[in-house]
A protein has these predicted regions:
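Conserved N-terminal phosphate-binding loop of PLP-dependent enzymes in the Aspartate aminotransferase
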Residues: 1-152
Length: 152
């Protein structure tokens, strides 16, 4: 992309925002073309530096690249098992969506009662955005609980 924005996770809870641009786009910008509410203060900058340090030290992105295909595989297994309830599974990395034929809110509510927090996106899509440190066992537990709901 020509411009990429990031916030929220960038400071791991400390309000901060940032954007990166290609050289061509950056060269076309002048001072004052872009303003920021959460950029550049010393606390936020220190938080971002620490987050980057931890990401590198703990190989967070390597872990995400290993675990994301597993999440996709497990969600698609559910789709194959319940084709009358799950219309589609799509997404990239650890940001996945499951489109249902029914109401996503019903499944989200039932999952909360089972101890798993999910969110819906619209009326028929469950959004999956686990923490970047999610493990296979967490995905398995979530999928087992989804299977209980879809199989009921």
């Amino acid at each position: 992309p020509d411009i990429m924005t990031s916030a929220k996770a960038l400071g791991c809870g400390v309000p901060v925002g940032a954007f990166a641009a290609t050289k061509e786009v950056a060269d076309a910008m002048c001072p004052g073309d872009h303003g920021t509410t959460y950029g550049g203060n010393p606390l936020a900058t220190a938080a971002v530096c620490k987050v980057f340090e931890i990401f590198e030290k703990d190989n967070i992105l390597g872990h995400v690249n290993e675990i994301a295909p597993y999440l996709s595989e497990k969600l698609n297994e559910l789709k194959d098992k319940f084709p009358d309830k799950i219309k589609d599974v799509r997404g990239k990395g650890l940001m996945m969506g499951m489109e249902l034929y029914g109401q996503a809110g019903d499944v989200v509510s039932q999952m909360l009662k089972k101890g798993v927090v999910l969110i819906s996106a619209g009326t028929s899509i469950i959004r999956f955005v686990p923490p970047l440190v999610v493990e296979k066992e967490h995905i398995d537990i979530m999928c087992e609980k989804l299977e209980e709901i879809f199989g009921a």
